[in-house]
């Protein structure tokens, strides 16, 4: 019997970062929004190192951001780069997937907008239903819980592409 790798998926955003810690898509260890204040590189890296110490992951999954279509702030790009640097120091394999990769995977399940992806994820993980944000209007900021769905989408994209 093979042992599943411990996977940590991190999706930095304006509130901190969405995260999922799992062995497989069906074996979730922990997930949520890690509020990071102040929003500084050092605080994000501290949180990453805490997760690594606590869960001992064998794989790190991050948002890719080099595609022309990806809109990402310099702050988030720097945080992702710092996560990569820390994972490399610890010889942890890193997998990165862009928003385009995520959309391509979820298009097969009925939609590729953030809202449609979130609805698909809640159909697979009913325990996330209370976190499900309403459809966002252009005049509203992104819902606090969307980071959880972003992290789940990233984790599921990894398993879909790699398996």
Regions of interest found by a model, annotated:
Residues 1-163:
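Phosphate- and other anionic-substrate recognition elements at nucleic-acid/protein interfaces
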């Amino acid at each position: 019997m093979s042992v599943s790798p411990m996977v940590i998926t991190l999706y930095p955003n304006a509130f901190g970062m969405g995260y999922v810690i799992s062995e497989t898509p069906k074996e979730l260890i922990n997930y949520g929004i890690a509020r990071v204040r102040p929003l500084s590189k050092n605080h994000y890296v501290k949180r990453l190192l805490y997760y690594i110490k606590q869960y001992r992951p064998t794989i790190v999954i991050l948002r890719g951001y080099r595609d022309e279509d990806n809109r990402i702030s310099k702050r988030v790009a720097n945080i992702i780069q710092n996560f990569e640097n820390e994972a490399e120091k610890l010889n942890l394999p890193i997998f990165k997937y862009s928003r385009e990769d995520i959309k391509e995977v979820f298009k097969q399940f009925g939609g590729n907008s953030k809202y449609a992806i979130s609805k698909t994820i809640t159909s697979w993980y009913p325990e996330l239903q209370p976190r499900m944000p309403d459809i966002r209007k252009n005049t509203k900021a992104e819902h606090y819980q969307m980071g959880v769905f972003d992290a789940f989408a990233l984790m599921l994209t990894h398993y879909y592409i790699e398996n």
